[in-house]
Amino acid sequence: LESQELMVRASWLYHVEGLTQAQIGERMNLTRRRINELLAAALEQGVVRISFSSPLAENVELEARLCSRFGLHDTVVAPAPADPAHMHAVIGRASASFLDRLIQVRKPRSIGVGWGATLHETVRQMTGANEPAMRVRSLMGGLTRGSEINTFEIVRSFAKVLNAKCHYFAAPIYAGSEEAHAVITAQPVFQEFLRDGSNVEVSFLSVGDVTGHSLQVRYGLPPQTDIGELVALGAVGDLLGRYLDAEGNPVDHPLNRQVISPELDAYRGIPSRILASGGPHKHAILLATLRAGLATAIVTDSESARMLLGASDASR
């Protein structure tokens, strides 16, 4: 299925959008020779005739429209699973394929990652590489209890599958108070880590919502946090532990002054900012991050892609 997805995507960009093979290679993180092979195979196998014969072509069209609408460099749209319980696995598989190609072609020197089930599924399905000079960093603090979806386990797993250097961020997601946050982040070691996190070449994160589906809501928030207060202030979800409104702006809540992660302005300085999330409960926060220009690439499902485009059309 992955090979057919690559074949259809390359063929669409070449035959419909008129990109050169070199441009397609850069867009898809593949060599020009590989693009040539995919285009030839598409013709030989009948994928490309007068029109596309694969149902995956609709996803490629959605990708092109999302890139155009939101100014994205890359988009991957995976078929929406029939069972929502499989969403993390579907987005994870698509993200793994995307990251494998990006790392193989672009050879980034540093990658920053977050936490969660989508990232866990991604690293579990990656082919892997041998990049001993690469640095993998956690971009935010982690849960205080062990878990395979925790920031610490995620960054360790990415470093292992890439044979890269691992840089932990030994801090909680949230300080206990605004005063404690000021004390923690005033320490030179934390200032250096936040600065280094903002200087990675690629970031790979998922977004969180404000429903019971959210692992952040269930496990990551400080005790006694009232998620209803965040919702009342207009929060639709979080990125890097920072709760945002529908336009992608941080809401005025103490939690956003307690989170230990890069400021959004610093995060925007990362050249390649990949967000991977899908499912109806993520629609509002995905749209918010795109409106605010917080991503350069997204990996999502086809139903979410249609929602993002429809919501954008409605606001015009």
What do the predicted segments below correspond to?
Residues 7, 85-96, 120, 190, ...:
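Short, well-ordered alpha-helical scaffold segments within catalytic/effector domains
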Residues 113, 136-138, 168, 275:
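Structural beta-sheet core signal
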Residues 118-129, 215-225:
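Short Gly/Thr/Asp-enriched flexible loops that form oxyanion-binding sites at enzyme active sites
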Residues 1-11, 15-29, 34-40, 46-52, ...:
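Conserved phosphate- and dinucleotide-binding cores of soluble alpha/beta proteins
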Residues 111-118, 278:
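Glycine-rich beta-strand-to-loop/alpha-helix junction loops that act as flexible
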Residues 40-112, 123-133, 142-148:
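HTH-adjacent hinge/linker in prokaryotic transcriptional regulators
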Residues 57, 117, 121, 281-284:
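Short alpha-helical
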